[in-house]
């Protein structure tokens, strides 16, 4: 059994980790930390976990966590995971960070876009945790930087096109996210009266997931990729629907595009390529680790429109983190994640 600890267990990504791991046949949850709810059972904070995980939440205790765990998930604000990772690596414990601390190849880019500063990677070997690209590297990794939710939806949607040189490197992305993406801390923007029957753009052209997208897309393309990104908050709890507008380098029809995607992702269980004329919907992936991808060719403007849907808390966060854990420990990748989406 893989012994697991979670720092930041009571945020949305933390509790989603517990939901998935509590039914994982190869995992034992040994340690859960929370600054806000320590000494309280997690099932008294989230009654959905009653009988599945009733473990008592504890204060942050590095030594205890590392004496009992094989892997630690950090579901903390940016800037807090590096210290934990350093101590864990010394003791041979693996770390999967759901924040942004280990997503960037260049630490200066992290400092430019994120407020939580720390003293760099300092020799920590980290891997960007998108299995569909870095599976072999993840197998050997000690520290994995779990991708952001928006970048996951965008990179998976665009990767076959960039790999095959079908589109140009200037891409427009429009994404809609459920309010759980804003986290559990209360704010005016995620109040019911502000979100209900309302959809609004935010952080236009300056969202901090932009450099993460550009970093990974550029590596796939072999040239610089620039992304014009507009995220929106939609009146739903979960889900991301990303629409990507790409200029074609040559004439291509939608059936050929389908064949390219179907071949590219034929071995990827969690990627579902929809047939021409069918488009992704967030409800079709709700509560699951799947990514649905669809597309359309606008011949009039020589534009390929790609759409992808994920659950922001699962494939966009905690599910992908568990997928990475499975790979790191040689466990079948689907274990604990072979969940049929909830519909309606």
Curated annotation (Swiss-Prot):
Transmembrane segments: none
Functional pathway: Amino-acid biosynthesis; L-arginine biosynthesis; N(2)-acetyl-L-ornithine from L-glutamate: step 3/4
Subcellular localization(s) per the UniProt record: Cytoplasm
Chief location of this protein within or outside the cell: cytoplasm
A GO term, aspect molecular function: NAD binding
Record HAMAP family: ArgC_type1
Protein name per Swiss-Prot or TrEMBL: N-acetyl-gamma-glutamyl-phosphate reductase
Species in which this protein is naturally found: Thermoanaerobacter sp. (strain X514)
Gene: argC
